[in-house]
């Protein structure tokens, strides 16, 4: 696969996002930047929703069920708008002029993030050599094989008994669509998704959220774009650690959901004029796909939107009328109860929440202020802008400024708690919904700090501009002012790249480089996998240690594997087969199990595992029941030929 294949996959993903998500957003009545930010959110909701509904309708996974759902929702929305428009005349709203500064604010971070993604990937078909990627790459293959992308189905790949009843599958469903529509490999389709989410969805949502809270000023948009590309805890960290692709998708959609919540609650500085019913529909379109991308993003929405909800409650309680106040209190209590219940329902099991503390309380606070989460190098520009935002909040004391500061405090508090709070029960109460895992909270913190940083930049720019005499400003030609503004925007984005970003790119890049000593799949092992489709029949199942990377024969070579992930449900047959592979000897029971599961080939990728040395299958080379078919370096492919001799 070439870079042209990757560019084509990116183009296809952008096209279907614009056509499907954009058309529905247009039908709902969104325009301009709101339309641009809504398109990927609506596309995610429509795609993930269609994936759940399609099996009930007897439809296999493809663009067809997605298109059907989009036409239904868009058509009904457009029809309602026409009928309502005829019955109730609306006050015409003057159309907004094209804002060149928004375009610049989006183009600069998009270009920088594309560049950073390409640096990290290194090659169009590279893939992250990390533990979680075994599941994510194989999950896409499972969607393609079963023609089912439902979040109620993906868990069956590793838990055939149904014990994993729900696994957020929005990411895997979209990547599968890319494979279907373009014919590229799963790694190339995954990389196309990485680029679109990181350089497209994220900066658009970030700029929209900042403008919604801090106002539609050019400096707000420019600063938001610079910060979006300048704090590597999101999105780069989630490309490095894990990898956490589904959470990255969900958090990239989070700013739009927050902006919708702010607009719907009536505490926005800048938002479209929509009736309550349309706001509710837009909110549903925002949170559906985000939640099915990763529930952790929805819990983050609950946490970061709390200041807005409290502001609305306070405003309502100040109004006269005991009935209004009683309804407000009842609604707020219902909100709290629902939030607590959702936190418990969406919380992962206790065994998955055991991540340890990593910093002292003082160091954690300094890390949060410096924006140096995980990489321990300050994000200088963002840190300065946040401090300016705090200062201007204390000076201006406007409602919107307090909301941005409150959002920042919540994000910082969650991060400090997860890395430093030495009270286990209290720590788990606050951050257990995100596995008590520092990288997840660091990524959420970036969303929380971004509006305040943009506000700090814009308010400082306004103050500095006011210091320039009016006659001096008037003497500057318009073209010169625009050129100076563009230069300042480029400079800010460039300065935001100083500090943490280069280290983050360096660390993340190492996980995408395939070498002779790669943690998951070495260059020799990959070479053997590329020949697998010529040597292993489609009907056969391949056994191998998933910790050594053998499980990726499923995603990379399109051959079924006995263990598609390291954390797979082990039944009696799998247990017997794995035990036989460890010993290099298949008894009658193990042979029966192998025959029942169609296991006819074995990959031996040695004792180098993704998390360090593993036991491996050391006895395979001496087994009379296995015949060597192919080898590349230390990687070997065997055929199980001697089971008829057992028993």
Region locations from a protein language model:
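Signature aromatic-anchored transmembrane alpha helix within multi-pass, membrane-resident enzymes
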Residues: 331-338, 401, 460-501
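Membrane-helix boundary/interfacial segments in multi-pass membrane proteins
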Residues: 57-64, 123-129, 236-249, 354-374, ...
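Membrane-embedded, hydrophobic transmembrane alpha-helices
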Residues: 1-98
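Hydrophobic, aromatic-rich transmembrane alpha-helices
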Residues: 309-310, 381-408
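Extracytoplasmic
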Residues: 12-18, 493-647
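Short hydrophobic alpha-helices at membrane interfaces in multi-pass membrane enzymes
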Residues: 264-288
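Perimembrane helix-loop-helix junctions
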Residues: 301-332
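Active-site lumenal/periplasmic loops and adjacent helix-entry segments of GT-C-fold
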Residues: 109-252, 508-511, 516-519
């Amino acid at each position: 696969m070439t870079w042209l294949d990757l560019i084509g996959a990116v183009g296809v993903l952008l096209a279907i996002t614009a056509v499907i998500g954009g058309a529905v957003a247009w039908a709902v009545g969104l325009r301009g930047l709101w339309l641009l930010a809504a398109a990927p959110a609506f596309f995610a909701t429509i795609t993930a929703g269609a994936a759940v509904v399609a099996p009930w309708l007897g439809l296999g996974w493809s663009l067809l069920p997605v298109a059907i759902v989009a036409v239904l929702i868009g058509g009904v929305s457009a029809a309602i708008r026409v009928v309502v428009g005829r019955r109730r005349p609306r006050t015409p709203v003057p159309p907004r002029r094209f804002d060149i500064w928004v375009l610049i604010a989006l183009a600069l971070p998009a270009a920088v993030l594309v560049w950073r993604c390409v640096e990290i990937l290194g090659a169009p078909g590279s893939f992250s050599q990390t533990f979680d990627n075994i599941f994510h790459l194989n999950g896409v293959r499972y969607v393609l094989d079963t023609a089912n992308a439902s979040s109620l189905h993906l868990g069956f790949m590793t838990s055939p008994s149904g014990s994993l009843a729900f696994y957020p599958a929005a990411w895997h469903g979209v990547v599968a669509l890319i494979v279907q529509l373009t014919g590229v490999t799963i790694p190339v389709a995954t990389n196309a998704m990485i680029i679109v989410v990181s350089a497209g969805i994220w900066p658009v949502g970030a700029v929209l959220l900042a403008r919604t809270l801090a106002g539609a000023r050019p400096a707000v948009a420019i600063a938001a774009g610079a910060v979006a590309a300048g704090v590597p805890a999101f999105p780069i960290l989630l490309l490095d650690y894990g990898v956490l692709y589904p959470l990255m998708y969900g958090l990239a959609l989070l700013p739009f959901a927050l902006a919708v919540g702010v607009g719907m609650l009536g505490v926005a500085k800048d938002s479209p004029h929509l009736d309550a019913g349309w706001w509710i529909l837009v909110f549903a379109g925002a949170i559906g796909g985000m939640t099915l991308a990763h529930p952790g993003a929805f819990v983050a929405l609950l946490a970061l939107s709390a200041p807005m909800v409290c502001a609305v409650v306070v405003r309502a309680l100040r109004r006269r009328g005991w009935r209004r106040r009683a309804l407000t209190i009842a609604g707020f209590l219902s909100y709290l109860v629902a939030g607590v219940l959702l936190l418990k329902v969406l919380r992962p099991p206790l065994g998955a929440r055991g991540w340890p503390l990593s910093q002292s309380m003082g160091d954690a606070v300094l890390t949060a202020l410096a924006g140096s989460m995980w990489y321990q190098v300050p994000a200088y520009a963002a840190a300065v802008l946040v401090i300016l935002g705090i200062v201007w909040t204390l000076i201006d004391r406007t409602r919107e400024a307090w909301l941005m500061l409150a959002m920042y405090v919540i994000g910082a508090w969650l991060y400090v708690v997860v890395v430093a709070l030495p009270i286990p029960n209290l720590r788990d109460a606050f951050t257990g919904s995100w596995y008590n895992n520092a990288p997840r909270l660091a990524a959420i913190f970036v969303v929380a700090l971004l509006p305040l940083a943009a506000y700090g930049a814009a308010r400082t720019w306004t103050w500095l501009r006011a210091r320039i005499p009016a006659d001096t400003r008037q003497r500057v030609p318009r073209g010169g002012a625009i050129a100076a503004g563009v230069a300042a925007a480029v400079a800010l984005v460039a300065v935001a790249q100083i500090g943490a970003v280069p280290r983050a790119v360096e660390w993340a890049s190492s996980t995408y480089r395939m070498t002779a000593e790669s943690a998951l799949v070495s260059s020799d092992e990959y070479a053997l996998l590329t020949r697998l489709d010529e040597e292993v029949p489609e009907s056969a199942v391949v056994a191998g240690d998933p910790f050594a990377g053998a499980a990726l024969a499923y995603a990379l070579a399109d051959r079924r594997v006995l263990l598609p992930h390291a954390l797979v449900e082990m039944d009696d047959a799998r247990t017997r087969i794995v035990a036989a592979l460890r010993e290099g000897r298949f008894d009658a029971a193990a042979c029966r199990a192998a025959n029942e599961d169609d296991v006819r080939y074995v990959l031996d990728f040695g004792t180098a595992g993704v998390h360090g040395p593993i036991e491996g299958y050391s006895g395979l080379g001496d087994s009379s029941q296995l015949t060597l078919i192919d080898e590349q370096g230390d990687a070997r492919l065997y055929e199980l030929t001697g089971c008829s001799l057992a028993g």
